[in-house]
A protein has these predicted regions:
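Single-residue recognition of alpha-helix boundary sites
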Residues: 13-15, 71, 247, 317
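Outer-membrane beta-barrel translocator/receptor signature
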Residues: 38, 50-59, 65-144, 224
Length: 368
């Protein structure tokens, strides 16, 4: 008969593994794109010693001292992206064109006179989108030669089955170092013991199995920075500035993966043995990272002669407070002509959050 199993794990990360995965995921959301005003992007971001542009508020705050008058500006970015997904049986192309405000800012300048040592004093605020995480994809494989469950079984080998089972006062997600996917798959009967050893496992795909697979993923989110800068012009030779950056980060990823198999090796509960039958399973995997950061920037520009400018800036590490949440849901249906049987295991674990600190280049700011 047909059996349905629903198993849910929220933030199913063992304590020892949470930090490592978070570091990897953090790297994937580290700002790495060249964004800003059209002038800034056209110059490849080489404005450390040039100044006089709204984008320099987040690069070298001394650039604000170059301003002779107040300015308001905004930059619109058209992001034209095409995603192509190919499998042995099909190819899918998708367009994901969007409009963004990459930069909005204001600089106010007070001219104090050409005879004063401090010729002018400027202040400014700006908003900049440092990164945008917009990706989507879909794929289908009409003829598979394996199963994700067999892969899970391969890296679960060596783990004692008792460590994967739930007990009255035992939760393997938090009380063991087992991989969360191993725990999820084992308790959903997607992987099962080989019948001989307590630490050897096999998946649903057997010698006679045929099937197909499908997946869909979507990423969204951003890293935005808000800058507040102050700077001045000393004798038209030395320009200085200090800036305070506040960052807002949000990253979301949704992944759906499913398999449908005939003549799969399915495990029956009453007989506790493996028989051939039809198996369909799907996993929804979600991840959310959100938080804020703060940094301080110091900058100078030296102009000894009219045609030469030398600039330098120091950025403090960016201190982040990040909340990392994740969850996975598995639906597993299988059919065999044996005796009636049913099971409905269900687990729910609380969400978890973590804080990280790093600099803008090597930030512990958790893609698979």
């Amino acid at each position: 008969m047909k059996i349905r199993i629903l198993l849910t794990a929220m933030a199913a990360l063992a304590a020892a593994g949470a930090t490592a995965q978070s570091a990897v995921d953090a790297y994937s959301v580290t700002p790495s794109e060249l964004r800003g005003t059209a002038r800034f992007v056209g110059m490849g971001g080489a404005f450390t010693s040039v100044g006089g542009d709204l984008s320099t508020l987040g690069q070298n705050p001394a650039g604000i001292g170059i301003y002779r008058r107040s300015e308001v500006g905004a930059t619109v970015n058209i992001s034209a992206r095409n995603y192509s997904t190919a499998t042995p049986t099909m190819k899918i192309d998708r367009d994901n064109t969007k409009f963004y405000f990459d930069n909005i800012g204001y600089v106010g300048t007070a001219n104090l006179g050409n005879n004063a040592t401090l010729r002018s004093f400027s202040w400014g605020v700006s908003y900049s989108r440092l990164s945008s995480f917009e990706r989507l994809g879909h794929g289908y494989n009409g003829t598979t030669d394996g199963s994700m469950t067999n892969y899970i079984a391969s890296f679960t080998n060596g783990t004692n089955a008792a460590d994967l089972r739930f007990g009255e006062k035992y939760n393997p997600y938090f009380d063991s170092d087992c991989d969360w996917m191993s725990i999820l798959a084992y308790n959903a009967y997607m992987i099962n013991g080989d019948g001989v050893y307590n630490d050897k496992y096999k998946g649903l795909y057997g010698n006679n199995t045929v099937g197909d697979a499908e997946y869909t993923f979507r990423e969204s989110g951003h890293v935005d920075e808000y800058n507040i800068d102050f700077g001045g012009n000393i004798s038209d030779v030395f320009y200085w500035g200090i800036g305070f950056g506040i960052l807002d980060m949000e990253y979301n990823r949704q992944v759906y993966y499913s398999e449908s198999m005939d003549k799969a090796d399915i495990y029956t509960l009453p007989s506790q043995r493996t028989v051939e039958g039809s198996a369909d399973w799907a996993m929804n995997n979600s991840k959310w990272i959100s938080g804020t950061g703060f940094n301080v920037k110091f900058g100078v520009i030296f102009r000894p002669i009219e045609m030469l400018r030398i600039g330098a800036a120091i950025h403090t590490p960016t201190w982040y407070s990040l909340n990392h949440q994740g969850g996975a849901t598995v639906n597993y249906d299988y059919y065999n002509p044996g005796a009636p049987e049913s099971t409905n295991p269900d687990t729910q674990n609380p969400l978890k959050g973590n804080d990280y600190t790093g600099d803008e280049n090597n930030m512990l700011y958790s893609y698979d």
